[in-house]
Amino acid sequence: MPKNTPIIRSLLDTDLYKFTMLQVVLHQFPAAHGEYEFRCRNHPDTPLTQLKQQLETQLDLLCELRFSQDELDYLRGLRFIKSDYVDYLELFHLQRRFISVSEEGEQLAIRIKGPMVQAMFFEIFVLAIVNELYFRPLDSKAVREEGRRRLEAKLAELERFQREEAPGQRFPLLIADFGTRRRFSRDWQAHVVERLNHALPQVFRGTSNVYLARKLGITPIGTMAHEFFQAFQALGVRLRDFQKAALESWVQEYRGDLGIALTDVVGMDAFLADFDLYFAKLFDGLRHDSGDPYIWGEKAIAHYRKLRIDPATKMLTFSDGLSVDSALQLQRHFSPHIQVSFGIGTHFTNDMGLEPLQIVLKLVSCNGQPVAKLSDSPGKTMCSDETFLAYLRQVFKVPALA
C-alpha cells in the first residue's frame, strides 16, 4: 500500500463516545482547553519511533477530512444528537497544529494541545493509525489465516453457548465490538464486525465504530470515557464534587439517553459514594473498565439493593481486556441477578498471533490544571503531577499503591 494512502478515510471511523462527549463539551464548556499524551505500556519488538515519518504523513491526511452530507444526515438521525451539533460538525475538521509528534530517546512522543472541542477528537484516529502502521510490515497471508482461524473458533464457542446454555439464562448474552483503537487494521475490523453480525445476530448488539455501524446498519454503541469525568476535575467545581458534576452534566444533556456510567476514574468505592438514589434511578447501568470484575459487579449489585432498586432492572457492561471465555464466565456468574453486556476490543480486532500494542492517548491536563485517573488496576493511572495525585487520593480516601 502506498505510504500516502490514508488509513483513516472517514471522520465517522471512530468510537461513538467521541461524538457523545464532544456534544456535551460544545454545549456546556466550549472554551475548555485540553492536553493529551501518548503512552505505550509494553515493549514492542520494533521501536515506535520508526513510525514517526509515516505517522506525520497520516496526520496530515487525517486533518484534510471533512464530514460528507450523507454522514451528517446519519448523525442527525441518531435521536440523542442535536441539530445544532450537526451544524457544527458540518464546519468541523481537525487542525494539524494541535498535534505534534517527536522522539524522546527510544519513545515515540505524541502530544495534543488545544481546545477540547478539537483535542478530544484525535485520540481514536491516532491510536488506530499507530497500530496499522506498526502491524503493516508484519501483515501476511499466514497472519490473516491465523486471525481467521482464531475468530472462527470464538464464533463457534459463542454459538455453542447460545445453543446449549443461553436458553437457561435469565438474561441474554450481549456482546459488542469495542476494538477500533487497538485494531490490526481498518479492513480487519470490518471483517470481524461483519462476521459477528452475520453469525451471531441474537448475541451481537453492535459496534462502537460509527462508520461500521452506519455501513452495516447496526447499532453504534458508547456513552462516555474517563476523559469526560477527568475534565471536571479542572472545570471549576470543588474537586470532591467532580463526579457528581460530570454525571449531572450528562443527565442534563441526554435526558435519559446513553445511560451507562463509567465507574473507575477514582475507583469504584469513591464512585458509589457519589452514585446516590437520584443517579442510580436515572442511569441504566454501570461500565467496568479496571480491577477485579467480580468484586466490582458484586459491589454494584449490593449498592442497587441498598438503594432498594431491583438489580434486574439495571445493566452491568464489562469492557476491561475481555476475551470470549472471560465474558462467558462473567455472564454465567451475573446473569441470574442483573442484565450484563460485554464490549470486547483487542481480543476481536487484533488477535492474529502477534503481540498487540498496549497504547493509550490520555487527557493529562484541562485548562492548565492536572487531571488524573485513580484506576482500580495498578499501572493504569496516568499523571505526571505527583502532588495532584496525592491530593486526589486524599480527597477520595484512595490508598496509595504499594
Swiss-Prot record:
Signal peptide stretch: none
Enzyme class: ligase
Glycosyltransferase is among the record's keywords: no
Gene3D superfamilies according to UniProt: nicotinate phosphoribosyltransferase
Pathway in which the depicted protein is active: Cofactor biosynthesis; NAD(+) biosynthesis; nicotinate D-ribonucleotide from nicotinate: step 1/1
Reaction catalysed by this enzyme: nicotinate + 5-phospho-alpha-D-ribose 1-diphosphate + ATP + H2O = nicotinate beta-D-ribonucleotide + ADP + phosphate + diphosphate
Key words, A-Z: Ligase, Phosphoprotein, Pyridine nucleotide biosynthesis
GO MF terms held by the record: nicotinate phosphoribosyltransferase activity
Domain of life of the organism encoding this protein: Bacteria
A GO CC annotation given for this chain: cytosol
Modified positions (Phosphohistidine) in chain numbering: 226
InterPro entries recorded: N/Namide_PRibTrfase, NAPRTase_N, Nic_PRibTrfase, Nic_PRibTrfase-Fam, Nicotinate_pribotase-like_C
Post-translational modification summary for this protein: Transiently phosphorylated on a His residue during the reaction cycle. Phosphorylation strongly increases the affinity for substrates and increases the rate of nicotinate D-ribonucleotide production. Dephosphorylation regenerates the low-affinity form of the enzyme, leading to product release.
Gene Ontology biological-process entries: NAD biosynthetic process via the salvage pathway
EC number(s) on file: 6.3.4.21
Family: Belongs to the NAPRTase family.
NCBIfam families: NAPRTase, PRK05321.1
Primary role: Catalyzes the synthesis of beta-nicotinate D-ribonucleotide from nicotinate and 5-phospho-D-ribose 1-phosphate at the expense of ATP.
PANTHER family: NICOTINATE PHOSPHORIBOSYLTRANSFERASE
This protein's name: Nicotinate phosphoribosyltransferase
Provenance organism: Chromobacterium violaceum (strain ATCC 12472 / DSM 30191 / JCM 1249 / CCUG 213 / NBRC 12614 / NCIMB 9131 / NCTC 9757 / MK)
Lineage: Bacteria, Pseudomonadati, Pseudomonadota, Betaproteobacteria, Neisseriales
Gene behind this protein: pncB
